[in-house]
Amino acid sequence: MIIERARELAVRAPARVVFPDALDERVLKAAHYLQQYGLARPVLVASPFALRQFALSHRMAMDGIQVIDPHSNLSMRQRFAQRWLARAGEKTPPDAVEKLSDPLMFAAAMVSAGEADVCIAGNLSSTANVLRAGLRVIGLQPGCKTLSSIFLMLPQYAGPALGFADCSVVPQPTAAQLADIALASADTWRAITGEEPRVAMLSFSSNGSARHPNVANVQQATELVRERAPQLLVDGELQFDAAFVPEVAAQKAPDSPLQGRANVMIFPSLEAGNIGYKITQRLGGYRAVGPLIQGLAAPLHDLSRGCSVQEIIELALVAAVPRQADVSRERSLHTLVE
């Protein structure tokens, strides 16, 4: 349902999706598909000559797909550097114009300036480089202290869709960071799925069944979430089965408001989250879409370097949903006014 909803919104209001890791057969196939079916307006950031040679060597068409060369667009780089300076002040590097000749930095600047709706990277670049470009050029959302990520775990055969966080950014989150991750993930889930989040703060303990500093960290994070968002349905600490299986929840956490039906799982550490999503993906009959980066002031998202063409397409679609939902609401309001 999540991908179907994203496709419907994409057809109504195709987003401008920029790909900085463009010299990749998977990206060219994904961009061609998105363009062909009117699901997005892809932009490839690369040297046109290098991209043309790459496409020819792989016998691929690039008809109608926009290509922007950061090296030959000095005026754009100068304009982006001015925005960077206005936002970051003295933290802006003196060679900002030169740094923006890097495709990843340039693409981040495009979404920061509103000249693209979404940036999808990471198919060739490391997560560290993607996050560095986002933090340096885009910066954090006002009031945000913790950058994090969420995977959408989609069933291939049966079962509910789930959100898994944080699986790629914060190695050992504090209680305050876990609370930030939970709140950001709840917002992302609501924006992309249109459903109310039911958040489980995961641990190896359920309702105090074990005592350990790591358990206490999750318990403290849960209380912080409740204080900051009293309307949010959240519980913790819970083991995965107590969060996901109603029959187990009835035994281990009978008073839990989630009743074993959580849809957003907050892992206590990056180690647990990364292992958990890969096990779910490889053994559990689920496919992973993401990770969607949470906390940046503009949408920049990070693929796994082992991603497939389908995963690139799906991330491009779901990442654009919040913007497209806003466009649809604006059009509906405009129609009502008329």
From Swiss-Prot:
GO cellular component terms listed in the entry, alphabetical order? bacterial microcompartment
Q: Which Gene3D superfamilies match?
A: 3.40.50.10950, Isocitrate/Isopropylmalate dehydrogenase-like
Q: Please tell me which top-level EC class this enzyme sits in.
A: transferase
Pathway given in the UniProt record: Amine and polyamine degradation; ethanolamine degradation
Q: Which SUPFAM superfamilies match?
A: Isocitrate/Isopropylmalate dehydrogenase-like
Single GO molecular function: phosphate acetyltransferase activity
Predominant location:
other
Q: Which family does it belong to?
A: Belongs to the phosphate acetyltransferase and butyryltransferase family.
Q: What name does the UniProt record give this protein?
A: Phosphate acetyltransferase EutD
Q: Which organism is it from?
A: Salmonella typhimurium (strain LT2 / SGSC1412 / ATCC 700720)
- The gene for this chain is eutD
